[in-house]
């Protein structure tokens, strides 16, 4: 969060300077590249404790997958919930483009959007983790949906830049509430089963829907159908 906050401030300063497009964005991408490279390099030296790997036969693995897909009701409910949550994937760019067209704000505001988004994400990620531990992670997951809904409502009825700032605060809150609850819910309903199998299955099922929402909403935006896109989200 601190790194993203610093990046948001840097981005705002870069975009406020008299640097022509696309050089201004190019500088931002160069900073992003070196930040990712440094992060990857540092992570390379991370040491993990050795785990005893329990080998399974292919037949056993297939049997486990079949059981999860066909018989685990909580897995089904969680998966359907996550499929609909995929609609929020293109939300950040969608809100930014829509609000830019509506209010014609200075492009440097993107840096401030990032700062607000990251602060909100960090605060609500921490808060939802505690809330989930106390009242169940389903509660935190519901908060994630609520905040994304508030972002959509704010966009539809936005009349000034204050509401635009609120949109990105709500997005950050939704993302922050989602991150701890999504993983912890898997641990809750997987119990003593292989969590990696559950996670792999969920990602495999979600991938086509994520692509569908990204392409579908992208197509609607190109047609100028922003309001319809918000209704879908």
Show where each model-derived region lies:
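Substrate-agnostic recognition of the 12-TM MFS/MFS-like secondary transporter fold
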Residues: 1-13, 29-45, 77, 81-92, ...
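A membrane-interface helix-boundary motif in multi-pass transporters
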Residues: 12-34, 219-233
């Amino acid at each position: 969060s601190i790194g993203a906050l610093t990046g948001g401030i840097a981005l705002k300063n870069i975009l406020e300077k008299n640097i022509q497009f696309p050089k201004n964005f190019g500088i931002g991408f160069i900073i992003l590249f070196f930040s990712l490279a440094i992060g990857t390099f540092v992570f390379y030296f991370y040491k993990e404790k050795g785990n005893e790997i329990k080998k399974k036969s292919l037949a056993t693995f297939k049997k486990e997958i079949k059981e999860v897909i066909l018989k685990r009701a909580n897995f089904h409910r969680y998966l359907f919930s996550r499929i609909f949550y995929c609609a929020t994937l293109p939300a950040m760019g969608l809100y930014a483009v829509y609000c830019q067209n509506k209010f014609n704000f200075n492009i440097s505001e993107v840096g401030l959007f990032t700062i607000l988004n990251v602060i909100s994400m960090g605060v609500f990620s921490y808060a939802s983790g505690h809330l989930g531990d106390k009242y169940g992670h389903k509660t935190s997951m519901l908060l994630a949906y609520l905040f994304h809904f508030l972002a959509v409502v704010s966009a539809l009825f936005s009349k000034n830049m204050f509401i635009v700032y609120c949109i990105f605060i709500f997005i950050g809150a939704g993302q922050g509430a989602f991150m701890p609850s999504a993983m912890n819910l898997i641990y809750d309903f997987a119990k003593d089963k292989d969590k990696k199998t559950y996670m792999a299955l969920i990602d495999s099922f979600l991938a086509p829907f994520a692509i569908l929402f990204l392409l579908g909403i992208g197509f609607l935006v190109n047609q100028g159908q922003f309001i319809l896109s918000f209704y879908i989200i």
